[in-house]
Protein backbone atom coordinates (compact mmCIF):
# COMPACT_ATOMS: atom_id res chain seq x y z
CA UNK A 1 0.00 0.00 0.00
CA UNK A 2 2.80 2.41 0.90
CA UNK A 3 4.62 1.57 -2.34
CA UNK A 4 1.39 2.28 -4.25
CA UNK A 5 1.22 5.72 -2.67
CA UNK A 6 4.85 6.38 -3.60
CA UNK A 7 4.18 5.40 -7.22
CA UNK A 8 1.14 7.67 -7.37
CA UNK A 9 3.27 10.57 -6.15
CA UNK A 10 5.11 10.42 -9.47
CA UNK A 11 2.09 9.46 -11.58
CA UNK A 12 -0.60 11.93 -10.63
CA UNK A 13 -3.22 10.84 -13.16
CA UNK A 14 -2.54 7.11 -13.08
CA UNK A 15 -3.86 4.16 -11.09
CA UNK A 16 -2.08 1.30 -9.30
CA UNK A 17 -3.45 -2.25 -9.27
CA UNK A 18 -2.44 -3.70 -5.89
CA UNK A 19 -2.63 -7.50 -5.64
CA UNK A 20 -1.88 -9.14 -2.32
CA UNK A 21 -2.61 -12.52 -0.74
CA UNK A 22 -1.42 -16.06 -0.20
CA UNK A 23 -2.37 -19.74 -0.45
CA UNK A 24 -1.33 -20.64 3.08
CA UNK A 25 -3.21 -23.95 3.09
CA UNK A 26 -0.54 -25.33 0.74
CA UNK A 27 2.27 -24.17 3.04
CA UNK A 28 0.98 -25.49 6.37
CA UNK A 29 1.03 -29.16 7.34
CA UNK A 30 -2.37 -30.80 7.75
CA UNK A 31 -0.99 -32.25 10.99
CA UNK A 32 0.16 -28.90 12.38
CA UNK A 33 -2.40 -28.46 15.15
CA UNK A 34 -1.08 -25.01 16.05
CA UNK A 35 -1.34 -23.31 12.65
CA UNK A 36 -3.62 -25.42 10.45
CA UNK A 37 -6.96 -24.56 12.20
CA UNK A 38 -6.58 -20.81 11.52
CA UNK A 39 -5.12 -21.06 8.01
CA UNK A 40 -7.00 -19.48 5.11
CA UNK A 41 -6.49 -18.73 1.42
CA UNK A 42 -7.29 -15.35 -0.07
CA UNK A 43 -6.26 -12.74 -2.60
CA UNK A 44 -7.23 -9.07 -2.63
CA UNK A 45 -7.20 -6.91 -5.76
CA UNK A 46 -7.43 -3.17 -5.13
CA UNK A 47 -7.35 -0.20 -7.47
CA UNK A 48 -5.46 2.68 -5.84
CA UNK A 49 -5.74 6.23 -7.16
CA UNK A 50 -5.29 9.80 -5.98
CA UNK A 51 -8.24 11.60 -4.42
CA UNK A 52 -8.96 15.27 -3.79
CA UNK A 53 -11.36 14.43 -0.97
CA UNK A 54 -8.91 13.01 1.58
CA UNK A 55 -6.18 14.50 3.73
CA UNK A 56 -2.56 13.60 4.40
CA UNK A 57 -1.46 9.98 4.69
CA UNK A 58 0.90 8.90 7.48
CA UNK A 59 2.83 5.63 7.37
CA UNK A 60 5.38 3.70 9.42
CA UNK A 61 7.32 0.52 8.56
CA UNK A 62 9.60 -1.34 10.99
CA UNK A 63 11.50 -4.64 11.08
CA UNK A 64 13.03 -6.79 13.81
CA UNK A 65 15.40 -9.20 12.10
CA UNK A 66 16.52 -10.76 15.40
CA UNK A 67 13.24 -12.69 15.51
CA UNK A 68 13.19 -13.61 11.81
CA UNK A 69 12.95 -17.34 12.51
CA UNK A 70 9.77 -16.95 14.56
CA UNK A 71 7.74 -17.31 11.34
CA UNK A 72 9.45 -18.91 8.34
CA UNK A 73 9.73 -21.87 5.99
CA UNK A 74 13.16 -23.46 6.64
CA UNK A 75 13.81 -25.09 3.25
CA UNK A 76 13.55 -23.74 -0.26
CA UNK A 77 16.40 -21.23 -0.43
CA UNK A 78 20.09 -21.56 -1.17
CA UNK A 79 20.96 -22.33 2.47
CA UNK A 80 18.63 -25.34 2.67
CA UNK A 81 17.66 -26.44 -0.88
CA UNK A 82 14.62 -28.67 -1.33
CA UNK A 83 15.50 -32.36 -1.31
CA UNK A 84 13.70 -35.62 -0.60
CA UNK A 85 14.85 -35.29 3.01
CA UNK A 86 13.30 -31.83 3.52
CA UNK A 87 9.90 -33.25 2.54
CA UNK A 88 9.77 -35.76 5.41
CA UNK A 89 7.41 -34.71 8.21
CA UNK A 90 8.63 -34.95 11.79
CA UNK A 91 6.89 -34.43 15.11
CA UNK A 92 7.88 -31.50 17.33
CA UNK A 93 7.73 -31.34 21.13
CA UNK A 94 4.12 -30.12 21.03
CA UNK A 95 2.81 -32.95 18.87
CA UNK A 96 2.73 -30.99 15.61
CA UNK A 97 3.95 -32.71 12.44
CA UNK A 98 5.58 -30.72 9.65
CA UNK A 99 8.48 -30.90 7.19
CA UNK A 100 11.12 -28.30 6.37
CA UNK A 101 9.16 -27.11 3.33
CA UNK A 102 6.20 -26.06 5.48
CA UNK A 103 5.50 -23.02 7.62
CA UNK A 104 7.04 -23.10 11.09
CA UNK A 105 5.85 -20.57 13.67
CA UNK A 106 6.79 -19.96 17.29
CA UNK A 107 3.45 -18.59 18.40
CA UNK A 108 4.55 -17.22 21.77
CA UNK A 109 7.34 -15.10 20.26
CA UNK A 110 5.08 -13.76 17.51
CA UNK A 111 2.31 -12.98 20.00
CA UNK A 112 4.66 -11.04 22.28
CA UNK A 113 6.04 -9.12 19.31
CA UNK A 114 2.55 -8.10 18.18
CA UNK A 115 1.30 -7.14 21.64
CA UNK A 116 4.43 -5.25 22.70
CA UNK A 117 5.50 -3.52 19.48
CA UNK A 118 2.29 -2.77 17.58
CA UNK A 119 0.72 -0.41 20.15
CA UNK A 120 4.01 1.54 20.34
CA UNK A 121 4.16 1.92 16.56
CA UNK A 122 0.53 3.07 16.39
CA UNK A 123 1.01 5.59 19.19
CA UNK A 124 4.15 6.96 17.51
CA UNK A 125 2.33 7.31 14.20
CA UNK A 126 -0.59 9.12 15.80
CA UNK A 127 1.82 11.47 17.56
CA UNK A 128 3.48 12.20 14.21
CA UNK A 129 0.05 12.90 12.71
CA UNK A 130 -1.01 14.97 15.74
CA UNK A 131 -4.01 12.67 16.05
CA UNK A 132 -5.82 10.97 18.95
CA UNK A 133 -7.49 7.55 19.10
CA UNK A 134 -10.90 9.06 19.64
CA UNK A 135 -10.77 10.63 16.16
CA UNK A 136 -9.91 7.34 14.46
CA UNK A 137 -13.06 5.58 13.24
CA UNK A 138 -11.55 2.12 12.80
CA UNK A 139 -8.37 0.16 13.51
CA UNK A 140 -8.19 -2.46 10.75
CA UNK A 141 -5.42 -4.92 11.63
CA UNK A 142 -3.95 -8.07 10.14
CA UNK A 143 -6.20 -10.88 11.34
CA UNK A 144 -3.67 -13.29 12.83
CA UNK A 145 -6.06 -14.83 15.37
CA UNK A 146 -9.14 -13.89 17.41
CA UNK A 147 -7.22 -14.05 20.69
CA UNK A 148 -4.27 -11.94 19.50
CA UNK A 149 -6.53 -9.18 18.15
CA UNK A 150 -8.58 -9.20 21.36
CA UNK A 151 -5.43 -8.63 23.43
CA UNK A 152 -4.16 -5.99 21.01
CA UNK A 153 -7.48 -4.18 21.29
CA UNK A 154 -7.18 -4.21 25.08
CA UNK A 155 -3.64 -2.80 24.92
CA UNK A 156 -4.78 -0.02 22.61
CA UNK A 157 -7.84 0.74 24.71
CA UNK A 158 -10.32 0.73 21.82
CA UNK A 159 -13.71 -0.93 21.43
CA UNK A 160 -14.61 -4.13 19.58
CA UNK A 161 -16.58 -2.04 17.10
CA UNK A 162 -13.47 -0.02 16.25
CA UNK A 163 -11.09 -2.98 16.04
CA UNK A 164 -12.86 -6.08 14.65
CA UNK A 165 -11.36 -9.53 15.24
CA UNK A 166 -14.02 -11.77 13.70
CA UNK A 167 -12.36 -12.62 10.38
CA UNK A 168 -10.32 -15.76 11.18
CA UNK A 169 -13.32 -17.95 12.17
CA UNK A 170 -15.00 -17.06 8.86
CA UNK A 171 -12.17 -16.82 6.31
CA UNK A 172 -9.06 -17.91 8.19
CA UNK A 173 -5.71 -16.14 8.31
CA UNK A 174 -4.98 -15.40 4.65
CA UNK A 175 -1.68 -13.63 5.32
CA UNK A 176 -1.37 -10.27 3.54
CA UNK A 177 -5.00 -10.40 2.32
CA UNK A 178 -6.58 -10.18 5.79
CA UNK A 179 -6.73 -6.37 5.95
CA UNK A 180 -8.64 -5.95 2.66
CA UNK A 181 -10.76 -8.98 3.62
CA UNK A 182 -11.67 -7.28 6.92
CA UNK A 183 -12.42 -4.01 5.14
CA UNK A 184 -14.64 -5.78 2.60
CA UNK A 185 -16.46 -7.87 5.22
CA UNK A 186 -17.35 -4.80 7.30
CA UNK A 187 -17.68 -2.35 4.40
CA UNK A 188 -21.47 -1.92 4.45
CA UNK A 189 -21.54 -1.21 8.20
CA UNK A 190 -18.51 1.07 8.14
CA UNK A 191 -19.86 3.28 5.37
CA UNK A 192 -23.56 3.04 6.20
CA UNK A 193 -23.76 6.59 7.55
CA UNK A 194 -20.42 8.04 6.38
CA UNK A 195 -18.76 8.65 3.04
CA UNK A 196 -15.26 8.94 4.55
CA UNK A 197 -13.74 7.07 7.50
CA UNK A 198 -10.46 7.79 9.24
CA UNK A 199 -8.75 4.42 9.48
CA UNK A 200 -5.57 3.13 11.08
CA UNK A 201 -4.34 0.07 9.19
CA UNK A 202 -1.79 -2.09 11.04
CA UNK A 203 0.01 -5.21 9.83
CA UNK A 204 2.55 -7.54 11.42
CA UNK A 205 4.19 -10.82 10.53
CA UNK A 206 7.14 -12.43 8.77
CA UNK A 207 10.40 -10.62 9.21
CA UNK A 208 9.41 -9.93 11.89
CA UNK A 209 7.88 -6.79 10.44
CA UNK A 210 5.39 -4.08 11.35
CA UNK A 211 3.57 -1.56 9.22
CA UNK A 212 0.88 1.04 9.84
CA UNK A 213 -0.97 3.59 7.73
CA UNK A 214 -3.27 6.33 9.01
CA UNK A 215 -5.49 7.80 6.31
CA UNK A 216 -8.96 8.94 5.32
CA UNK A 217 -10.70 6.23 3.29
CA UNK A 218 -13.58 7.29 1.00
CA UNK A 219 -16.53 5.06 0.22
CA UNK A 220 -15.67 2.74 -2.66
CA UNK A 221 -17.73 2.36 -5.81
CA UNK A 222 -17.19 -1.40 -5.69
CA UNK A 223 -16.21 -3.65 -2.78
CA UNK A 224 -17.26 -7.29 -3.06
CA UNK A 225 -16.16 -10.88 -2.39
CA UNK A 226 -15.78 -13.46 -5.14
CA UNK A 227 -15.68 -16.99 -3.74
CA UNK A 228 -13.97 -19.94 -5.40
CA UNK A 229 -14.24 -23.62 -4.55
CA UNK A 230 -11.31 -24.75 -2.42
CA UNK A 231 -9.03 -27.44 -3.75
CA UNK A 232 -8.36 -30.40 -1.45
CA UNK A 233 -5.07 -31.15 -3.19
CA UNK A 234 -2.13 -31.50 -0.82
CA UNK A 235 0.94 -29.77 -2.26
Model-derived segments and their meaning:
Residues 5, 9-43:
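Flexible, glycine-rich active-site loops centered on histidine and acidic residues
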Residues 32-112, 116, 120, 216-235:
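Condensing-enzyme catalytic core mediating Claisen C-C bond formation in acyl metabolism
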Amino acid sequence: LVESFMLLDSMKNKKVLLITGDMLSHKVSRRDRASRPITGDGVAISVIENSLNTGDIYASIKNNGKAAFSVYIPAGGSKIPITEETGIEREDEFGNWRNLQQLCMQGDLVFNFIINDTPVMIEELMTEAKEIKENVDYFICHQSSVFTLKKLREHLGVSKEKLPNDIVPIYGNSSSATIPVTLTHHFSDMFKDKNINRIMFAAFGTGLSLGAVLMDVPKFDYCEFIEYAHSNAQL
